[in-house]
C-alpha cells in the first residue's frame, strides 16, 4: 500500500507541467542556499514558476519558486513520524484505532495544511488539518 502512496505522489508531481526547464540564476541560487545537501533535483516549469523535485531524509519535496527566486509554495510527502507531535496527538484522540498511512503537507506564505490518509482494517480516511490541529474528515472509503 505504501507503494500506492508513492506512485500517487509521483503522478501528481508530473501532472500539468513541462520538463527541460532552465530555472533562472536567482532560482538556482535560492535553491542551493536553502538545500545545500541536495544533489539530485529535477526541475519543471509552468505558469512562469519553477518547481524543484527532490528527496531528502526520506521526505519527497516539491518546492515552487517565482522567477525572482522566492518560494511561493512547498509540498512535502512523508509518513507519521514527521508530523508535528501536536497534530499526531490530535489524530490519535479523534481517530483512535486508525494508523497514518501517509501525509501531504502543503505550505504557502499564509497557510500550512496537512492532508493525512488514515487506515484501519476496513477503511481509508482522508483528513485535513491546519497547523493548529483543527481537522475534519474529507472523505472515507471502504477497502476492497
Residue ranges, per PLM feature:
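Short, non-transmembrane alpha-helical segments in secretory-pathway proteins
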Residues: 21-39, 81-99
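Exposed beta-strand-loop-beta-strand "reactive/processing" segments of non-cytosolic proteins
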Residues: 39-62, 106-126
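Bacterial Sec-dependent N-terminal signal peptides
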Residues: 1-23, 31
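Amphipathic N-proximal alpha-helical interface segments
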Residues: 52-77, 125-139
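Surface-exposed, polar helix/loop patches in the mature regions of secreted/periplasmic/lumenal proteins
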Residues: 85-134
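Generic beta-strand hydrophobic packing signal
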Residues: 41-43, 74, 101-103
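A short acidic/small-residue loop/turn micro-motif
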Residues: 78-81, 142-144
